[in-house]
A protein has these predicted regions:
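Hydrophobic faces of well-ordered beta-strands that scaffold small-molecule active sites
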Residues: 3-9, 33-35, 58-62, 86-88, ...
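A short, Lys/Arg-enriched amphipathic alpha-helix followed by its capping loop at the start of a domain
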Residues: 23-31
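Short, acidic/polar
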Residues: 12-24, 69-77, 138-148, 193-200
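Glycine-rich phosphate-binding active-site loops on the catalytic face of alpha/beta enzymes
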Residues: 81-93, 192-224
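Conserved anion-binding
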Residues: 2, 70-74, 79-155, 163, ...
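Active-site-adjacent beta->alpha loops and helix N-cap segments on the catalytic face
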Residues: 14-19, 39-54, 66-73, 90-113, ...
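Structural motif
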Residues: 27-28, 54, 81, 152, ...
Length: 234
């Protein structure tokens, strides 16, 4: 997979999701889609299968975090959905990440890409220290989680675009960085605290960017998506 824009389908129902996707019916480039907790928990595996049937790649964003055996079994179930990327929390430890990778790998050796979440882009230094009692600088925490994920055999991490370049320096250029917290220069940052524009994310080395409301809530979602692709992929 090359650089791509992943559109966060943060909708509550199949109807709302397909009302959005229908706007892209005439587009040659089918958006890579992120299905998160709200939509997956509302509609279940059926929504994944229906979207795949339309020809979209899918990042199933459920952020698993539990004891290793539970995560292994859950990943085994997810491996049957034919998604392209899925993820977990790096804070679950190396043992959990290794178990997840084992569960996700199919009998023929194939599997979706497995990505670790480091620190959410809604987390800043103050909230990390006060709420999580983590005193280390946030960029060092991200680097530590990235190193643990790489040593566990994962394909990359979700991180702020502010950390993408440092992650590649630490873990190698082939270790993928998927970066939310991307907004247009003239857009609202919403509840994200560590943000960057698509062009800046490209310059710093992000492999994928995840964009939600700047596209899904735009007056013209197709134009917003194409603008994002032009800034990041072209």
């Amino acid at each position: 997979m090359g650089k791509d824009v992943i559109v966060a389908c943060d909708f509550a129902s199949t109807e709302a999701t397909f009302a959005f996707l229908d706007k892209f019916a005439d587009c040659q480039r089918k958006p890579f889609l992120k299905i998160g907790m709200e939509l997956y928990y509302a509609e279940g595996p059926a929504i994944v299968k229906e979207i795949k049937a339309r020809g979209h790649k899918i990042f199933l964003d459920l952020k698993l975090h539990d004891i290793p055996n539970t995560v292994k079994k859950a990943m085994n179930v997810l491996s049957r959905l034919d998604v392209d990327i899925t993820n977990l929390h790096a804070a679950g430890t190396k043992n959990m990440m290794k178990a997840a990778l084992e569960g996700l790998t199919r009998p023929d050796g194939s599997r979706p890409l497995l990505i670790a979440v480091t620190q959410l882009t809604s987390t800043d230094q103050e909230s990390m220290e006060n709420d999580l009692l983590i005193r280390e600088p946030i960029d060092e925490v991200v680097m530590h989680y990235a190193q643990c994920a790489a040593e566990s055999g994962l394909d990359g991490i979700v991180c702020s675009p502010l950390e993408a370049g440092k992650v590649h320096d630490r873990c190698g250029r082939n270790f993928l960085t998927i970066t939310p917290g991307v907004r247009f220069a003239d857009g609202d940052v919403g509840d994200q605290k560590r943000v960057m524009t698509p062009a800046a994310a490209k310059a710093i080395g992000s492999d994928y960017i995840v964009v939600g409301r700047p596209i899904t809530a735009a007056a013209d979602p197709v134009a917003a998506y194409e603008r994002c692709v032009a800034e990041f992929c072209d």
